[in-house]
UniProtKB/Swiss-Prot annotation:
Name of the featured protein: Cytochrome c oxidase assembly factor 2
Family listed: Belongs to the COA2 family.
Source species: Saccharomyces cerevisiae (strain ATCC 204508 / S288c) (Baker's yeast)
Gene from which this protein is expressed: COA2
Membrane association type: Peripheral membrane protein
Record localization: Mitochondrion inner membrane
PANTHER family xref list: CYTOCHROME C OXIDASE ASSEMBLY FACTOR 2
Functional summary from the UniProt entry: Required for efficient assembly of cytochrome c oxidase in the mitochondrial inner membrane. Seems to be involved in the SHY1-mediated step of cytochrome c oxidase maturation. May aid in stabilizing an early COX1 intermediate containing the nuclear subunits COX5A and COX6.
Keyword Mitochondrion among record annotations: yes
Keywords for the protein's UniProt record, in alphabetical order: Membrane, Mitochondrion, Mitochondrion inner membrane
Length: 68
């Protein structure tokens, strides 16, 4: 193989590797992750929602007891 041909092949290999690496990082930044987010599945979020519901229930009961 001649040196010029070998040089072109190596340059094309490096260039294609760079493009693939750049594209894989760029695609990860553009497309959203299909997995569930960590916050939506965490027990802290569920506990906070339950606490808010409990507080609303207490306020509702307190408002009803004041009417009576």
């Amino acid at each position: 193989m001649r040196a010029v041909t070998r040089n072109k092949i190596v340059n094309n290999l490096y260039f294609s590797t760079f493009l693939i690496a750049f594209a894989s990082v760029a695609i990860g930044s553009v497309l959203p992750c299909p997995a569930h987010s960590v916050d939506s599945d965490s027990p802290a979020v569920q506990q906070h929602k339950l606490q808010l519901a409990h507080e609303q229930e207490l306020k509702r009961k307190d408002a009803l007891s004041k009417k009576i």
